[in-house]
Amino acid sequence: MGLFTRDLQSLDDLFMHGLKDIYYVENQIVKNLPKMIEAATDAELKKGLKQHLGETEEQVRRLEQVFELLGDDPQGTRCPGIDGILKEGDELLANVDGRKATNAAIVAAAQAVEHYEITRYGTLIAWATELGKEEVVPLLERNLREEKAADKKLSAVAEARVNKGSSRRARKTGGRSTKRKVSRAPVKRKRPVARRCAS
């Protein structure tokens, strides 16, 4: 989010820039989530991602309502932050070997996105409140609640299913101990020497 530009001279400027930022973010997520859904092999994870795709599409529509309430046309501002997070997620998935490890990587990538969104929505709500834009706060708060709920569901799936499956596979394959048993030669014990008592 490129906040430090000459065009941003007031809190209202910051708010509108942030709104365009999150609008871009949500649209990028709509484009990227199908790849995660296709790659996921855990049934619960796939189901949760599909549900969140529908939520994200609805979040885009809510943001368009926010623009409309503010008398502006919906438009996005390219966000290097989310571009970097999504690229890192793609690279992580491309380098992961094994179905269960892939599911864990998907959760990690998805939660990185969720945490970014949660931060952005929290900031926008605070700015909207300060600027007296109360009419848009409920829409932003609804999006924030959904992001927090999605993050919580991802954590639950990871703890109950995905991470356990990945760790079990690691123990069976790549998680073997690298310590070698050292064979030691038997220690020869010296027989005690009988000493004569001095008479």
Question: Predicted segment positions?
Answer:
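Amphipathic alpha-helical hairpins
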Residues: 1-199
